[in-house]
Amino acid sequence: MSTTISDSIASMISRINDIVITVAPSGDSNDSHRHSQIICDGGRTIQPLDDSSETTLAYADPNNPYLSNIDGDFRPIEQLSEEAAVEQATQLREAIREHDYQYYIRASPIIADRAYDILFDRLQALEDIFNLDTEASPTRRVGGEPLDELETVEHVTSMLSIDQSTAVDSVRDFDERVRDVVGDLEYICEPKFDGLSVEVIYEDGEYIRAATRGDGNRGDDVTAQVETVGAVPLKLHGDYPSYLAVRGEVYMPKAGFREYNRERIECDEKPFANPRNAAAGTLRQLDPGVVAERPLSCFFYDILDATELPPDQWTTLNDLQSWGLRTNDRISRVDSIDDAIAYRDQLKAARAELNYEIDGTVIKVNDRGNREILGATSRSVRWAFAYKFPPRAEITHITDIVVQVGRTGRLTPVALLDPVDVGGVTVSRASLHNPEEIKRLSVNSGDEVRVRRAGDVIPEVAEVTQKRATGTFNFPNQCPICHSSVEQDGPLAFCTGGLTCDAQLVRTIVHYGSRSALDIDGLGEQRVEQLVESGVIGELADLYTLSVADLSKLDGWGTTSAENLIQAISETQTPSLTDFLVGLGIPEVGPTIARNLAGTFDNFDAIIDADEAALREIEDIGPTVSTHISEFFTNEQNRAAIDNLLSAGVTPQTQQSTATTNAPLSDLTFVFTGSLSVPRTTATTYIERHGGNATGSVSSNTDYLVIGDNPGSTKRIDAERNDVPEIDETEFTELLAEHDDTLTWPP
């Protein structure tokens, strides 16, 4: 047997007690009776025997599905007592976690992949045969049962975005703003990963939940998917806090992406455009087993909440690493913005060498106290800035220019291109934005142009490199869909047809039923186009008068699919006021502003009647947004569409209207901190089910801060600042009984 194999397996079992592995000698692969034996004696002594040794202690079992085509096996499982199996499984879990830590965190694997697989397969066999599976077992990474759909969950604290720019002047402006408030400071500079941001929660060191960023307040529950990612530990390492919520970036390494796309092409499947799309698409798979087969990885870079928060970002990164949460090794601690700019330039030069995609750097204020002073808006933090790389660009030709009609009636010119690779993505269409941009570029079909991906995402025409066509594209004065007249609003052009324009109607209905609005399952764009083109739907309110007969006569519809859609639509007749406002498609009104509107006014009519001055008093609503809201509700076509929705039985529910005798906790807002007797998600669901609100951060609107074991300091400081009373779980139980003696805790 070769020294390399012997050394690898010796290392492999150095942490496992009283396990025997037999390995066929390399000299004669056909000799099934000659084995080298390696014994680990209580984890202390390793005794590899020479190649001439013979043993009958263990033989490869061709009927064992967990050990196929390998060089060795452990003692036959049927010879183990249940007690021995439990002990061996515990030892194997510890060994595999240690090897995961060495591989993902220290990047210094001490065993070969083949040897690791032997350990993993043995553990899986023990767990299946003796029913020993645990929540934190490494074998859970192979993926569980497929899900019916992705649930939406609320984050423990808002996952805010970061202001960004490719201009160095913007970076210096950020530095001046920060120093004006807090004076001298340190920055931590990190790569800006181009993947999918996730929140991961651990309780008592064990993996509990993972969710995508979503809108920053709520995201998709991807717990089953993320637990298959090898770089995400299911059990933390070292001296970890009892409660921990962290932020990381799931990504697909470049090498894995290339290999995965090669496999898709061989199977006649469409390849992914880039690693980010591949990672995002994979993580949203309903079958965790599919996720487990794809090459995802993860970097962690922030602590969102914990029983005790580190004093600064540098300590945060070191703590994450010590707990087995993989951090990036290209991080710098600097004193000046010049050094931060230099870091970005160095990272840009090294970008092609990295095995993961980045699109810039993130400059963060190091000290947590300074961060709290700087604060945040509802959208982004004020203590960090993303210095982006300039978008990649290539030269190609325009073959045609078409005009698209959006949901709000906005007309957008789009250049059709000879396909060109821009930063690893094949681009065949690029935005020309608006009529003014066409005039500025003096562009027409046939011209040679430079195309770039704005923000490394959206293709756009940057400039004409060679004029090959005569003149400039003539922008239409009629809508290309409904032929209504086109009106100019500054640099933008709009169709005046409103919801009588099929293009606007289709996009309006799709938006109304989207997950960020009323979340109508089965109401995708292709189905809506079919419903509009066939004349089954002529306006938004027609959704609520659809019948099985209407749908069954259309191609591709059966009785079951028709009944399912009608049921999904009927469940939205009493939407929350927030979701209804989002669904209406008011320009610039997303979930945050809709939530602020719903929380300020008593009912929907009050919002409709509010003047711009009253609207501007609301958080996050300035002159532009207030004008959009006011104009939307004074538009006759919009008012008619809303009246028809209300006549069809749609009744938006305010917080006040949902406060019934069956909602004993209505009007109460709770925040939890520390480890509770139940998972945080269970507590949140319980509060909401009984009419209350459970939020991730303390504000003046919070009624109670519920304190669990080992609570964090930030929420308690905020509670003291806002005069919010603190109660423990016992007092919380008593409070529930005061409101309704049928409420019990734990639920």
Swiss-Prot record:
InterPro entries referenced in this protein's UniProt entry, alphabetically: BRCT_dom, BRCT_dom_sf, DisA/LigA_HHH, DNA_ligase, DNA_ligase_CS, DNAligase_adenylation, DNAligase_N, NA-bd_OB-fold
Binding site for Zn(2+): C479, C482, C495, C501
Cofactors, names only: Mg(2+); Mn(2+)
Record: active site: K192
EC number from the UniProt entry: 6.5.1.2
Biological process, per Gene Ontology: DNA repair; DNA replication
Known function: DNA ligase that catalyzes the formation of phosphodiester linkages between 5'-phosphoryl and 3'-hydroxyl groups in double-stranded DNA using NAD as a coenzyme and as the energy source for the reaction. It is essential for DNA replication and repair of damaged DNA.
Family annotation (HAMAP family): DNA_ligase_A
Protein known as: DNA ligase
Annotated source species: Haloquadratum walsbyi (strain DSM 16790 / HBSQ001)
Gene name linked to the record: ligA
